[in-house]
């Protein structure tokens, strides 16, 4: 396979955990899920998509149901253990972040990797970055899971690998709030094999938008059930809808596609030959693929309009009475939406988004909050 094809295959669809889906247009918002349903709902495909008559995802739904049982088992085990935790955390537990040595394997221009960096920076978690070559991917040869982001967390003698951006974020947030061992926390987000609409086996993760907290901890973080539900809903929206608007917009025209791949090559880890081939042949390939994505996701003729509508819908959800969805500080949904949009910075799509929607004040507030909290890493 020539370098350009390998780069395109790495960056679309799977190398960045960017699994573009065939079939109907994803719903911009998902119905409220009960806690018991998150093993199979928040971690897997929507019930509507799974139930579509004749869909190959019926097999995936069955697999997720089996995996969901495992998730419920771990959730029940967590609940029993949570009852034994002390209500007050010791001073040592307040400095949990200092115990972790984190290494993030990423593509800098991947929206899912950007989400994780936004979370780590806002929570002042120092980490090392390993930029993965999208052609050879030798940097992650240690892992059977071949998508990025991958986060390796070293805690004393224990080393844990966390996969999937939303699992990474939920697991680390649970760790910071509850003080539970990270080794135990990651068992609450079981990996499950499923078959997507293209008939390809994929890995889904149960409970990935759920923080494993007891009632007191949840009250401390959210203040109420509505805030928790809202955060989870919009985190999933960022993954299931917003992220799928990026490629059709940044590769919308040949000129934009070339500018996007110029940025990818400059920011990524490419050899001289790989970079030159990727810039021109990759741009041409992704320009054509963007047209398929436009049709696949049932976007408007002018795909900018879908991006604008998504941004304004998000701004409306945040509302005028609070600076962030999280209130006075960004929550996980704020960080997810910001992380996805940030990968377009410097491109025409980003400039148009800032000019033609009301999202810029919120975006700059999140950027400032992250900058003020971020440590050197």
Curated annotation (Swiss-Prot):
Widely expressed. Expressed in the heart, including apex, inter-ventricular septum, both atria and ventricles, but not in the aorta. Also expressed in fetal heart. Detected in various regions of the brain: cerebellum; occipital, frontal and parietal lobes. Also expressed in the lymph nodes, skeletal muscle, kidney and trachea, but not in the thymus or lung. Overexpressed in colorectal cancer. The keyword Phosphoprotein applies. InterPro entries: Glutathione-S-Trfase_C-like, Glutathione-S-Trfase_C_sf, Glutathione_S-Trfase, Glutathione_S-Trfase_N, PGES2, PGES2_C, Thioredoxin-like_sf. The modification Phosphoserine is found at residue 95. Pfam families: GST_N_3. Residues 75-377 are cytoplasmic. Keywords: Cytoplasm, Fatty acid biosynthesis, Fatty acid metabolism, Golgi apparatus, Isomerase, Lipid biosynthesis, Lipid metabolism, Membrane, Phosphoprotein, Prostaglandin biosynthesis, Prostaglandin metabolism, Transmembrane, Transmembrane helix. Gene3D superfamilies: 1.20.1050.10, 6.20.200.30, Glutaredoxin. Residues 90-193 form the Glutaredoxin domain. Its EC number is 5.3.99.3. It catalyses: prostaglandin H2 = prostaglandin E2; prostaglandin H2 = (12S)-hydroxy-(5Z,8E,10E)-heptadecatrienoate + malonaldehyde. Residues 263-377 form the GST C-terminal domain. The record marks 87-88 as: Cleavage. One of its GO terms (biological process) is lipid metabolic process. GO terms for cellular component: azurophil granule lumen; cytosol; extracellular region; Golgi membrane; mitochondrion; nucleus; perinuclear region of cytoplasm. Homodimer. May interact with CEBPB. Interacts with EXOSC10. Isomerase that catalyzes the conversion of PGH2 into the more stable prostaglandin E2 (PGE2) (in vitro). The biological function and the GSH-dependent property of PTGES2 is still under debate. In vivo, PTGES2 could form a complex with GSH and heme and would not participate in PGE2 synthesis but would catalyze the degradation of prostaglandin E2 H2 (PGH2) to 12(S)-hydroxy-5(Z),8(E),10(E)-heptadecatrienoic acid (HHT) and malondialdehyde (MDA). This is Prostaglandin E synthase 2. It comes from Homo sapiens (Human). The lineage of its organism: Eukaryota, Metazoa, Chordata, Craniata, Vertebrata.
